[in-house]
């Protein structure tokens, strides 16, 4: 019972970590493509 709970928490934390890494990677790729344009706008 306890092992199953730890496994469930581990999988949940793992999925959140993977999602966070994916979003960070997507943001870095987006910033690499459109970052210069945003800087030139000088908002």
From Swiss-Prot:
It holds the Pfam family EPV_E5. Keywords: Early protein. InterPro entries: EPV_E5. It comes from the Viruses. Belongs to the papillomaviridae E5 protein family. This is Protein E5. It comes from European elk papillomavirus (EEPV). The gene is E5.
């Amino acid at each position: 019972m306890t092992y199953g709970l730890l496994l469930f928490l581990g999988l949940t934390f793992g999925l959140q970590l993977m999602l966070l890494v994916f979003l960070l990677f997507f943001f870095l790729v987006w910033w690499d493509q459109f970052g210069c344009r945003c800087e030139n706008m000088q908002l």
